[in-house]
């Protein structure tokens, strides 16, 4: 637990700095467009409005994030899929709301690859156990391409994947904004955007432990409300959302615009059971297993439904 605390202490990205407010810590894997609503909520003061002093913590390792959540080192996580294997084994983690309801990844390939079937015999960069591996396998399975038809190369991180493509080590990789656009500017091409294929897949959200939900329901609802406001504002105010990416993530404006356009239609604070099931299938495919629990056992949409109704949203 001391190691987890040390990791978290070195990973805090940004906070509201709201003196007198109730501290809240929420973890996300990386500065990715799928977590944009959480950052918009920070920028627009939605956490402050709820009396919360929010710290958004970057924890790249899903296992570490889950351990930190279960150990009360953090209060919430913004991911949906990475914690599922732990949930299937009995971890008390509950999905409360959604930020992005479609995968944000694009399959980026060398110019010679024109169709998904052309991936046969190619080397694909992946991060084993992560969402890129799950998404890659889901795409290949949908197109009836088996693992034997491709070669997976373990390359964690987007920038190293792009470098590996430039060096000819791999010919394809699943990349999220802004890395996909950066790769395209470097001469590669977007073969397919997974959001166009998997149109209801709960990709990022808000989750907490059942213990926290039971013992601090109003605290949880305030956090849900802040995130829901972030999702709605991100969807309805493109320029604000783009400016957050430029300011906080140091994106070039054209990169931020491309990233926003890819994600805008998938901004929805209320997950569907089907969407969570599809994400569970992604995780199961990546681990070569099957989901061990029905998703309704680890979803609690009471707060998000109440908040959406209170805010007058459909």
List where the protein language model places each region:
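Bacterial N-terminal signal peptides
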Residues: 5-15
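Pocket-lining segment of extracytoplasmic ligand-binding domains
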Residues: 81-82, 152-153, 159-248
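Secondary-structure end/capping motifs
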Residues: 214-291
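Conserved C-terminal helix/tail region of periplasmic/extracytoplasmic solute-binding proteins
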Residues: 284-314
């Amino acid at each position: 637990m001391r190691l987890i605390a040390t990791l978290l202490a070195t990973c805090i990205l940004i906070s509201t700095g709201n003196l007198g407010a109730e501290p809240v810590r929420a973890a996300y894997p990386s500065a990715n467009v799928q977590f944009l609503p959480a950052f918009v909520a920070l920028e627009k003061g939605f956490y402050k409005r709820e009396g919360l002093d929010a710290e958004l913590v970057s924890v790249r390792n899903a296992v570490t994030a889950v351990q930190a959540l279960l150990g009360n080192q953090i209060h919430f996580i913004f991911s949906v899929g990475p914690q599922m294997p732990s949930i299937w084994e009995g971890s008390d983690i509950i999905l409360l709301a959604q930020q992005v309801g479609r995968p944000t990844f694009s399959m980026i390939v060398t110019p010679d690859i024109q169709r998904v079937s052309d991936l046969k015999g190619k080397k694909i960069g992946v991060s084993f156990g992560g969402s890129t591996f799950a998404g890659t396998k889901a795409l290949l399975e949908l197109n009836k391409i088996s693992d034997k038809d491709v070669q997976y190369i373990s390359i964690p991180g987007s920038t190293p994947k792009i470098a590996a493509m430039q060096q000819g080590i791999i010919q394809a990789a699943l990349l999220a904004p802004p890395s996909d656009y950066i790769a395209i500017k470097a001469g590669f091409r977007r073969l397919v955007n997974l959001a166009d294929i998997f149109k209801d897949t709960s990709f990022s959200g808000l989750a907490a432990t059942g213990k926290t939900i039971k013992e601090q329901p109003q605290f949880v609802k305030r956090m849900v409300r802040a995130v829901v406001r972030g999702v709605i504002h991100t969807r309805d105010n493109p320029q604000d959302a783009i400016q957050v990416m430029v300011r906080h993530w140091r994106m070039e404006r054209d990169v931020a615009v491309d990233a926003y356009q890819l994600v805008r239609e998938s901004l929805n604070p209320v997950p569907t059971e089907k969407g969570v099931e599809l994400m569970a299938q992604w995780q199961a495919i990546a681990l070569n297993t099957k989901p061990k629990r029905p998703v309704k056992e680890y979803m609690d949409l009471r707060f998000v439904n109440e908040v959406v109704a209170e805010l007058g949203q459909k």
